[in-house]
Regions:
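Glycine-rich ThDP/TPP pyrophosphate-binding loop and its adjacent helix/strand module
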Residues: 1-169
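Single conserved hydrophobic/aromatic residue that forms the stacking wall/gate
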Residues: 170-180
Length: 180
């Protein structure tokens, strides 16, 4: 896109890649892209890498999938800043995204956002995660959803009242039911 838009300064088209935690740390293509990111012909002016870190790769625990504590550690090979945020706190995710964009635009370098979260359901419709990760999924099932946590925050700080919030949920559910 940068080529076709004649974006020679690499400022108008911002590459963004979304990765799973296991894929980011385990697929060689990520390391290859980092290794080539500073080379003429491969430089994008910095890519924003977003890791959806659900702390499990299909059914594999992180300690069996990589040698480092965080999947984002791979970004250290190019000194990319790594921003960790809580997936249950949408405002922290937005804050990290703003920092990432500002950094990328100013320094033309890659940046990594590691959204630490969880997968409430299995890897796919045929996966029952409590078979392979019983302790983790016992905790996840008792943990409130991000929507519930953030909704309560907005209600408690007076951003929205409960009836308006419930109306938004109802309207959203109705739109989903209609296929919108």
């Amino acid at each position: 896109k940068q080529f076709f838009h004649k974006d020679t300064k690499r400022k108008n088209v911002i590459p963004m890649l979304i990765h799973g935690d296991a894929a980011f740390a385990g697929q060689g293509i990520v390391a290859e892209c980092f290794a080539m990111s500073g080379l003429k012909g491969h430089n994008t002016g910095g890519t924003i890498h977003i890791i959806v870190n659900n702390q499990i790769g299909f059914t594999t625990s992180p300690r069996f999938a990589r040698s480092s504590p965080y999947p984002s550690d791979l970004g250290k090979i190019v000194d990319a800043p790594i921003l960790h945020c809580n997936g249950d706190d949408p405002e922290s995710v937005v804050h990290c995204a703003k920092i990432a964009i500002e950094f990328r635009q100013k320094f033309s370098k890659d940046v990594v956002i590691d959204i630490i979260c969880y997968r409430r359901f299995g890897h796919n419709e045929g996966d029952e995660p409590s078979f392979t990760q019983p302790s983790m999924y016992k905790k996840i099932r008792s943990h409130p959803t991000t929507l519930k946590i953030y909704g309560e925050k907005l209600i408690n700080d007076g951003t929205i009242n409960k009836s308006d919030f419930d109306c938004l949920l109802y309207t959203s559910d109705a739109a989903d039911d209609l296929g919108r």
